[in-house]
Curated annotation (Swiss-Prot):
The chain crosses the membrane at residues 10-30. GO terms for cellular component: cortical endoplasmic reticulum; cytoplasmic side of apical plasma membrane; endoplasmic reticulum membrane; endoplasmic reticulum-plasma membrane contact site; membrane. Residues 417-430, 483-494 have a biased composition (Low complexity). It comes from Mus musculus. Homodimer. The modification Phosphoserine is found at residues 59, 358, 374, 411, 464, 468, 470, 613, 619, 623, 638, 660, 662, 674. The modification Phosphothreonine is found at residues 417, 419, 428, 621. It comes from the Eukaryota. The gene is C2cd2l. It is a single-pass membrane protein; Peripheral membrane protein. The keyword Chloroplast does not apply. This is Phospholipid transfer protein C2CD2L.
Amino acid sequence: MDPDWGQRDVGWAALLVLFAASLITVLGWMLQYARGLWLSRADGGRDSRPASAAEPGGSLRELGVWRSLLRLRATRTSTPEEAGVRGLLASLFAFKSFRENWQRAWVRALNEQACRDGSSIQIAFEEIPQLPPRASISHVTCVDQSERTMVLHCQLSAEEVRFPISVTQQSPAAVSMETYHVTLTLPPTQLEVSLEEIPDEGLLVSWAFTDRPELSLKVLPKLQTRERDEEQPELSTVEELIKDAIVSTQPAMMVNLRACSAPGGLVPSEKPPTMSQAQPSIPRPTRLFLRQLRASHLGSELGGTEELCCAAELDNPMQQKWTKPMRAGPEVEWTEDLALDLGPQSRELTLKVLRSSSCGDAELLGQATLPVGSPSRPMSRRQVCPLTPGPGKSLSPAATVTAELHYEQGSPRNLGTPTSSTPRPSITPTKKIELDRTIMPDGTVVTTVTTVQSRPRVDGKLDSPSRSPSKVEVTEKMTTVLSESSGPSNASHSSSRESHLSNGLDPVAETAIRQLTEPSGRAAKKTPTKRSTLIISGVSKVPIAQDELALSLGYAASLEASMQDDAGTSGGPSSPPSDPSATSPGPVDALSSPTSVQEADETTRSDISERPSVDDVESETGSTGALETRSLKDHKVSFLRSGTKLIFRRRPRQKEAGLSQSHDDLSNTTATPSVRKKAGSFSRRLIKRFSFKSKPKANGNPSPQL
């Protein structure tokens, strides 16, 4: 056996192994390549089917053969999905906001299309036409689709869509404007809906009629009774303009596709997190204030008696605010502020400049649209927007409207939720004045003026009247006139001076007591600021020849003497004065008497701030004497309150007989003390009846004096 044969066998074996390995490697690569090619072809056949439908062009597309085949294939393949797409569109139109935005997009596109026509007759569609409930969308099919676009065909039908339009006709002589009511009947018409995804913005939805539909229009002027002259446009012309605008327009709207946190709770299968407190929500603008509204470069032809106003319209929720009209001119500025409530869906704000015409209508000169409601924008900024001319109007290219936008921040969880907070008391001082007037049969007028003054503050203390103004509410009751037989206690005035009532008072006194004790319409509330003033005015029984000051001082001295008589009767024997001149001091003595000094010392600062002085009351009422009581809180007196004043006023005329007993005190000022005590005037009886029952204490405190 040849030894070289073994070496040659080993070499051949090694070559065979290398060849087999190479062959296996090549087969493996071939199988892998074939598998990848097969998978790519399978996936490409599914994905490129609609895309390949858009590739062929030329004569096939022009002849419509390829399109017919594609439509047939698309219809057959999308038949199971038609119900789903139709249900999606129906669900979107079920939302009020989507439906309103859809209608608003229609109106905006119609107005833009109508403005493109350069004829002398311009039409303007007013927002917002009512969508009929019978409007339906059917036969929804997908005819084209790519990575970012989709084209749908659907059938739209609506019955009697009613909306108003404004028609403006310009002529060399004048400009006329009239409103028309339009009734539109839309038969089943095919509509093409295009969906396009725009990065970082949302989904752009646009629609248009594939073919010219057969529209049925009925146009009626708003003022049918007015005779139409030659200057008014023909109804047929208006109908043609409306049809052209509806058919030629292509509305579009943007649908937001940004992700947001779900407002609902967690998924039931998930467990709630262990966090004790949720992070507070970020506040966002909830209220928008428009300030310093200004329209510039409007044109030099504006002026005269015309007036301009600015209207601000928010898209969602729909709001409209107007400014006060200002005199027209090239530069117009409105000083008042406009407030608008923003919502989560607020996107656009429209500013309109309107001109008031001679017939009372408002003509749109121009408008501008600016975005609002974005949390990323600054909270306060100044915005300058160019004005787009209104229908049939011409403005300067430099016409602008300027507004300062100020956002007021608020938390979203507080929107629409009433917060229960304690109402803050009003810090404005209030004063309520009630007047009650009664006219007695003899002509005596009994008037009670009750003043309730409140000065609430945050700390609960009363403030000075000079620090803050007061709100005064005056309530005057109906004047009561008593006849001869309808006195307070059915007592005739013709009775003698000694015929008193069962309680010892005459009709004047009873009327005064009734007015002071009668509950008023307000709630009974004890307050240290309540003050009642009783004014009794009438005629004097004897001529007044004395000086005014001497008469008032003498009257005060007589009251003081009567109090000394009462004190002497209850406390111990005292000799009554025998001469009026001895008991009635002169003007100088009366002003410098210890009693006056003592009363001045006892008058506290609160009494001065709460009650007006006697001089002030006398200057207003012309009284000849005043009687003011001190605090009666510790005494059993029902009708006299703290700060009650009895003011007796006389009239400068005479009456000889049949006068009220309340004016006996004027005649008793010059009589002797014995005659004055025997006569028993009204003032003495009133003081005796309501005098203090308690005796002076032994500690030396002075007895209260009236």
